[in-house]
């Protein structure tokens, strides 16, 4: 009986000891576990910190790009020139270009249009190759038969290659009001090279204003039944807008066969083209900007 009482007392003391040891610890993590937990939290912060910095940097770049990108909207009809001397003309607006047609000579005084980067890279429609009289022309006009076996190409002023963005613009580029007699090696050579270069400049600068045409003189020879005038020379003047204003360049080509001439060697100030043609180019640009742009070629702005 004494032994039994002893066992009961011993068990009771053991229970009290276990209770005193474990119960106070129930609301606390072991020190080692608390430290590990802190390390895990710290590791997560360390992992997310670089990600946050990258996000911040990306946002900053987007903001910088947005603020440093400028879009220059050229006023409508800035490309339209003005004849300095009295000359017969009928101004006709087509989808892709505007033409000043001279019925006395059956050719244009000038053709003007804006070529955007979107238009320059478009391949929406194929070349037409259907040369037809311009239905809007009043008075005498050239006909296809005038060019037959003449030794001259039907040379585009506004090229078909610039009109691939619209089926209508493509068709209208083959109107004979947009065509002049050109020597084959001019039309298919350096003139074509300049047309292709213009598309590259339009892509580089977002938009390019183009005015092109024949140099009209009173002693031009004629061809065909309708006595279409044969120009002695052709011109093309170009302009685009930057954060520093307008930049312009001109070209003048004799109507002859060319071999190895480079485009850069044929480039001249727009003022020189104005003197040769009797045309005031880009007259709607403020005079101070126009005069600066046309006086000299800023070679740093034209890549060849």
Question: In which residue ranges do the predicted regions lie?
Answer:
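Domain-level detector for secreted/extracellular nuclease and nuclease-toxin modules, and
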Residues: 1-304
């Amino acid at each position: 009986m004494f032994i039994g009482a002893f066992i009961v007392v011993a068990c009771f003391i053991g229970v009290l000891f276990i209770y005193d040891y474990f119960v106070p610890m129930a609301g606390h993590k072991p020190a080692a576990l608390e430290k590990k937990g802190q390390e895990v939290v710290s590791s997560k912060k360390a992992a997310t910190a670089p990600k946050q910095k990258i996000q911040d940097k990306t946002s900053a770049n987007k903001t910088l790009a947005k603020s440093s990108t400028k879009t220059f909207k050229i006023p409508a009809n800035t490309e339209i020139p003005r004849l300095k001397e009295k000359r017969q003309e009928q101004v006709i607006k087509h989808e892709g270009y505007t033409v000043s047609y001279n019925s006395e000579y059956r050719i244009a005084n000038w053709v003007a249009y804006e070529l955007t980067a979107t238009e320059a890279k478009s391949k929406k429609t194929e070349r037409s190759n259907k040369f037809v009289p311009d239905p809007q022309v009043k008075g005498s006009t050239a006909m296809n038969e005038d060019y037959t076996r003449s030794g001259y190409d039907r040379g585009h002023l506004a090229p078909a290659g610039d009109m691939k963005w619209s089926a209508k613009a493509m068709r209208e580029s083959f109107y004979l009001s947009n065509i002049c007699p050109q020597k084959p090696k001019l039309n298919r050579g350096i003139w074509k090279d300049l047309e292709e270069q213009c598309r590259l400049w339009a892509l580089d600068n977002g938009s390019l204003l183009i005015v092109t045409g024949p140099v009209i003189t009173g002693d031009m020879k004629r061809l065909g039944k309708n006595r279409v005038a044969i120009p002695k020379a052709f011109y093309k003047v170009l302009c685009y807008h930057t954060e520093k204003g307008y930049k312009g360049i001109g070209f003048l080509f004799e109507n002859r066969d060319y071999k190895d001439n480079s485009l850069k060697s044929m480039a001249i100030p727009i003022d020189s083209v104005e003197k040769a043609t009797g045309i005031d180019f880009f007259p709607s640009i403020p005079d101070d900007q126009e005069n600066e742009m046309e006086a000299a070629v800023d070679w740093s702005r034209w890549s060849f």
